[in-house]
């Protein structure tokens, strides 16, 4: 299975984290679990059926889907050629491109053609016909460049959220009180701004970012969980295990023993598609 990433050009660097691709050499069926990562993404499931378990059974995801902010893990089954093209946004940046409530899109997989302005459908048809990752990156870049050129990203609320996300990524804050104080706004205003642009509270995003940091240590079975907890700024191992399980649905030990045929590509510490907190250029 091949995994590739392409970073956006400078015109999109503050709104798109990266473009990514997964492609297998032959058709197969896979099972995996997806975890909350604080970001939204568009995924083209090319010649691949994706079923997601929402707790009431498995349901088919759209061929071209927006994966809204996740607040819990989801088990998935994929069948077919295992070809996926993706666009990973920052926690707040997809809000620039749609009039829909980001908060209302949480924990949903939605046909993204229903969310974006006219013109996207034609681009989708061309991408699905070509089935070429380079063409996908080129087409999506042109489309979102056109959207960005017509968007006002200077609003006070968006700028405030952008500053907040940067500080959370850089681990410069650990509470909404300190974050609001640094930005000279009320906690209520900051909470409302996050709900509008991120779909999560600052506390939820901070929890997810810290959760992500654990994976670079979990890949090494020789790292004791107590040491991992301290490295990721948890109070102790018990606190880490409880927090991890609330977002992963399994314990750290169970995760180490579980196969992740798709997630393994995103959880690598060099990946931009999942571990976006390691980038400081947001």
Predicted regions and their residues:
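Extended, basic/helix-rich recognition subdomains
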Residues: 196, 220-227
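Conserved structured core elements
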Residues: 205-208, 234, 238
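A general nucleic-acid interaction/assembly signal
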Residues: 179-180, 190, 214
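Alpha-helical bundle regulatory/interaction domains
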Residues: 1-162, 166-177, 183-187, 201, ...
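Alpha-helical DNA-contacting segments of helix-turn-helix folds
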Residues: 154-156, 167, 194, 198-218, ...
